[in-house]
């Protein structure tokens, strides 16, 4: 069963591409027709590509790995932040920090700096500083939080990147390509799908279009997370079963030994009684 359907995508306006003069020829396989100078995306292909991407994302989530969502354009910021948070995944909705992937250790240092500020503020270390110094530190903390707050839990490179506008987020895509990180992307008719591993041809300018596609993908990721949780519970239960079995066996051995000792004691008593009678 498909994660989404033609009518849902049509209602969300996923089929609207860009003006013909702005098109990228590499998107030709995904274009259905031209209407009033605007390219119309083939939604049947979009449905198939959403299913393909959703299944891959489900497996990534099931394996316990992270997917980094990227959307710095105004129309997609809020919806991406909400959907990514719903599956406990990191996201970037402000300016893409240069070297976010290729220079990840430096980014981690900045995140740790933010954590250190929080720790020192909580334990009262900064209470002896002047108001001006405290204000400077607070501003620095706010700046770091705005850019890196949503990736604070990302302790290692993500296993995949999910990009809303591959042309706008071209730096992020290039960094991922350089490191061999798979890229999922909503690709409009004016963009180049060449360096995108999982192409989802659709309107990347309409909030509703982005939301519908993310709904399908995140639903698949939730399934993956739930399956991972269920497997973990089963493994823990399986691990406890042999242990309990061993305990029962030991208890049985103790009972057998007690019975044997009782029998031997009874025999000894009978033997002594026979001696006395004799």
From Swiss-Prot:
Any GO BP annotation: translation
InterPro entries according to UniProt: Ribosomal_uS2 (IPR001865), Ribosomal_uS2_bac/mit/plastid (IPR005706), Ribosomal_uS2_CS (IPR018130), Ribosomal_uS2_flav_dom_sf (IPR023591)
The entry's keywords: Ribonucleoprotein, Ribosomal protein
GO (cellular component) term, any one: cytosolic small ribosomal subunit
A Pfam family reported for this protein in Swiss-Prot or TrEMBL: Ribosomal_S2
Source species, domain of life: Bacteria
Spans annotated as Disordered: 233-258
Disulfide bridge map: none
Single GO term (MF): structural constituent of ribosome
Presence of keyword Glycoprotein: no
SUPFAM superfamilies cross-referenced by the UniProt entry: Ribosomal protein S2
PANTHER family: 30S RIBOSOMAL PROTEIN S2 PROKARYOTIC AND ORGANELLAR, SMALL RIBOSOMAL SUBUNIT PROTEIN US2M
Record family assignment: Belongs to the universal ribosomal protein uS2 family.
Protein name: Small ribosomal subunit protein uS2
The organism's taxonomic lineage, starting at the top: Bacteria, Pseudomonadati, Bacteroidota, Bacteroidia, Bacteroidales
